[in-house]
């Protein structure tokens, strides 16, 4: 495979020596080396529950967690870091949007458009909202 097709492939260790085209990101996304290194550093230096304690390691984890929220806020140009909500995964995030927002705002006659190729985690919540 021509490595010039996607210059970002080099950032993903799994894709270095494999011509794979990984498209199952709804289930598990591949991580670039910088993310793998950051997660490793967290586990080595600050592995504690953020927002759960007042001991030094928990406070450090909380600060890193809130710093990440601010980084995401700046990256997506959100008006405030309070607009950034972390979820465990895409499924949880989609359920949160579908059941806490859409269920109360989508009205009869509104259309919810999803592709037939969608992962069930993105199809089923919208079907449930539509059936209500």
Protein language model annotation of sequence segments:
Residues 1-132:
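Pyridoxal 5′-phosphate
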